[in-house]
Amino acid sequence: PEPVQPTIVETLRAAAEPLPALDDTEFAAAFDRFGGARVVLLGEASHGTSEFYRARAAITRRLIERHGFTMVAVEADWPDAAAIDRHVRHLQHEPMRTPPFTRFPTWMWRNRDVDAFVNFLRRHNGERPQAERTGFYGLDLYNMTASIAAVLAYLDSVDPEAAAIARRRYGCLEPFSREPAAYGREALTKGYAMCEEPVMQSLMDMLRKQLDYVRHDGDRFFDATQNARLIADAERYYRIMYYGAHHSWNLRDNHMFDTLQRLMAWGGKDSKVVVWAHNSHIGDARYTDMGTCLLYTSDAADDLLC
């Protein structure tokens, strides 16, 4: 007779490992085994669920305090997370037109659990020199309007002539600032990428002048170029979203993975990152219909734990 195959429940029960309660100090200690990884991916089954957020915060705090993790990268828009990063690393405040994380869904990041973690990061960093402080970064591409404002503010301060040119180029997207998806419909109707060339030219101009700009402030240049990359990818994202979910989903995941790679390169060989994102982004998607994910697109999977 053929051997009896275990049920899904039996398989899960055999693999599952009991954990202490979230508030128990031993809960986070159970994850010390991952302290040697360079990237730890912490998922969630649903956005805004307190238990997931508290668990990730406890694990991340342990990895930062005991194992030297230097970055927290989350499924959030770059310019919004950058405002939090400046706060937790005690950097100069650069006001946004609107407060961070006010774009739907606000409850995803504007909640008590995230606030408590942000307060921990600020206290933790306040006791350390600038080079040893842990940063907070966004991997996602949705807040195109805030990224445009950030790029223009940066160029206004270092290269007013380039700022004027970029302002004209980004003006192509201005009619769609309140509803970016409308740009995709417009581009689809007209049959061409109306704003692709202007936004790519702005990014390329910044990269060509990298040596000049970095002399002013390397961190601010990195932030500005990340915003410029977000604008370029968001333009493409909203343009192709009407061609099918797979195309836009994979573009978004590729953007997040590329951002993660740039963060790690910018942070240096000793940088260690904790990633917070939905399971659909950081799980292994090889056997799903989505095709790519942060883990699957990596060519350095040995450094990843999720």
Predicted segments — roles?
Residues 37-43, 70-73, 121, 137, ...:
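Beta-strand elements within well-structured catalytic alpha/beta cores of enzymes
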Residues 113-116, 127-137, 142-244:
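Long, well-ordered, tryptophan-enriched scaffold segments
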